[in-house]
């Protein structure tokens, strides 16, 4: 179980070999310190004097308040002057749909070239491609087209803020239950200390909605209605479909059935809204295949595929993401190991679900740095079972702080390395838990074979 620490050491050495600015290092250190400063007093809160508890809570909520003020300023600035990425793309989808245009035809977006005076990358990846989201996702974007971009952005931020607040409360209930105001403060602090939160707000992205829906699925993952949350998550971000691996391996057929039925209902609703021509254009035009190759290797992309492409100094060329041999081999290896562990785990199956979640971030070819907002769930699983981790509380705090710092660096492949490290730690804990149960439980014990 000590081998993940060697990985951390190697990564630290590699980071010191980079040309890091003082600003970058300060940002990474601040993120790590803030996280540590929240986790440690939370763990020892029952043993602290009253005045220390009050002081710690005051610092936590003061930090949250400062973050809220800064993010409010970002939102206000973007509502007044919407930046190029990403909300502008969502709003264009809505405008095309509002006039009953085909959102998957690049010709529908030519009017926006003069309106926005876009740069080359925006033109190549958006205006010359058309919508890359599947038809049922357009149910989320169509209402944006009935307002001007400023009003639409304001309403969009209201929706995302509501999702963020709901996600904070769910994080408290699921992973920090019984801790009251401490849990609420820690959940909010961990979210705001994660760089993905700031990037999500800056881009106007949908990660808060995805986080909320995944948390709802996590809460209900043993109930059939969990399939509804998965279907809605797939509507917001297509990569959520990877999470179906978990109910399939656990043979939760009702969850799978509810996911399929809910997805079909959403698809039928989008068919009625978009019309058959636009709906089937997604499948005949294959808009994602027209994306420029640099989308899969740009620095903001921290997927396994992007790391391989950058390391080899080769683009996709004429091949698609699924035609890269090294990517296929490594993806298959990670998927097989994850599947085996999920299948073997019977107790503390949260490790298995967390493994599938991290695997999704690693393998999805379009994983961007702000998708790491979802990584908070696996980290809280590790925190919840910190007695399993080498070093206990201190080892767990060190790991989480290091992951936060690596993500905040945003240098090279540091975000990918952080995600891979979390996967390795979870895999190690799952193996340890499986072997420990086999040693402790007598052969044929029901505890070992009964799903938890």
Where are the regions that the model predicts?
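Primarily membrane-embedded glycan-assembly and transfer machineries that use lipid-linked glycans
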Residues: 6-226, 250-376, 384, 437-440, ...
